[in-house]
């Protein structure tokens, strides 16, 4: 479920085209272990895809917190 929310949020915000800004949102939200490869894994919905990795809830929360900071 988190992957689906994350993927849709990236699309709505345009951050699917700006991974650096997405990484900044994670860092501002306090999640410092996000990476470009994790972003790719977390936006993958097909669980049979070798890239798929379930997005932890704390990562999604930090991402939203970072987006709020960026929006200020």
Residue ranges of model-derived segments:
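A short, Lys/Arg-rich alpha-helix, primarily the initiator
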Residues: 1-15
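A cross-kingdom feature marking solvent-exposed beta-strand/loop segments within repeated
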Residues: 3-4, 18, 24, 31-56
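Short, structured motif recognition centered on aromatic/hydrophobic residues
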Residues: 6-9, 19-22, 26, 58-67
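Charged low-complexity interaction tracts in eukaryotic proteins
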Residues: 48-72
